[in-house]
Regions:
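N-terminal low-complexity segments that are often proline-rich with Ser/Thr-Pro
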Residues: 154-156
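Peripheral, non-AAA+ core regions of ATP-driven protein-machinery
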Residues: 1-148, 152
Length: 156
């Protein structure tokens, strides 16, 4: 089963949509992240693995492939931890797949707690432009977004 979770990335100061596709398949157990990830994105495998266990779920003993699309754009930072976790849990049937109108950003600690990420304001503005109806971010980032002007206010 392939589960797609919406997220966002930054290219310079402009936000763009990233589709986080999570697939479980047979074969030797592995956890691969593809789609031009940087070192921090590749390290998300260990944070996600620990968070799955911390939330009381079993980590799948199968081949896990996470594709970050569009593959031609470099993905940087820890912003994809949360969408990878949600995609993995949905792919193995532990949670329902997220609604298509929702997007997710957030770094995971080894306990599964969310940590703030950088660049949420331009990503939130891109989310509004892309028609995202619900944007889920760590609490520390939500405070910043709540006190910032609406993307509609900045377009005038």
């Amino acid at each position: 089963m392939v589960v797609t979770v919406r997220s966002l990335g930054l290219q310079g100061i402009a936000g763009y949509e990233v589709s986080v596709e999570c697939a479980l398949s047979g074969g030797l157990p592995a956890f691969d992240v593809v789609g031009l990830p940087d070192a921090a994105v590749k390290e998300s495998r260990e944070r996600v693995r620990a968070a799955v266990r911390a939330c009381g779920c079993k980590f799948p003993v199968s081949r896990i492939t996470v594709n970050l699309a569009p593959a031609a754009l470099r993905k940087e930072g820890t912003v994809y931890d949360l969408p990878i976790l949600l995609g993995l849990l949905a792919a193995q049937g532990d949670v329902d797949p997220p609604a298509p109108g929702a997007a997710f950003l957030g770094e995971l600690s080894l306990t599964g707690a969310l940590r703030p990420v950088t660049g949420t304001l331009p990503m939130a503005m891109a989310a509004a432009r892309l028609g995202v109806k619900e944007l889920y971010v760590p609490a520390e980032n939500a405070c910043l977004l709540y006190t910032s002007p609406s993307p509609r206010d900045t377009e005038r």
